[in-house]
Amino acid sequence: MVERGFIVAGARILKRTWQIYVAHVFLFAIYIAEIAYVASSFENPLYVEEMNALDFLKTQDVTIMQALLLKFKPANMDVLPLYIVLLMMFPFALWLLIRNASLALAISVALYVLTWEFGWNFASYPSGHWFFNPFAWQLLFVFGAWCALGGAARLAPALRSPVTVWLAIAYLVFAFGVTLTWYFPRLAFLIPHWLGEWMYPI
């Protein structure tokens, strides 16, 4: 990336964005066709509703346009739209990352915090918001690029610290405990009420 320059890197990112968008459109068409076929074959309209495809079958013309705008997403088709939006935004972040990686990371963290504070998100069709919020998930993209541009070397001493290792172990134990409550509801009392409200749905 650094050797070829920002223009080439940005063009490649946008090209990949277009490829993923086209793939998403094809997957959407196949997915909707399969849902319609299964629903008609087994005469189960509830299946269409569960897959979040009921609006498409009622108003195809409007819903197709909303799907092309990445606003309408059937069940389990949230990931590629998120990736498309993040890749579209990334060339702008890349421009700043090359010049001042730490500043770019700071802006990314600030955007993440403001997203939580003000509830920023993209609107979905026919109602609601994106399940995977691009304003929040952008932090992973920027952090990964920051690490690749030298940030990982700066973090190395902290990552090798015994304190970090024990914090990671404590987190794994906590996550294991939370997971156990899903399979053994009697253990749900171990999760504080305020923590459960903050954490779910996940």
Segments the model singles out, each with a brief description of its role:
Residues 1-202:
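Alpha-helical transmembrane segments and their immediate juxtamembrane cytosolic regions
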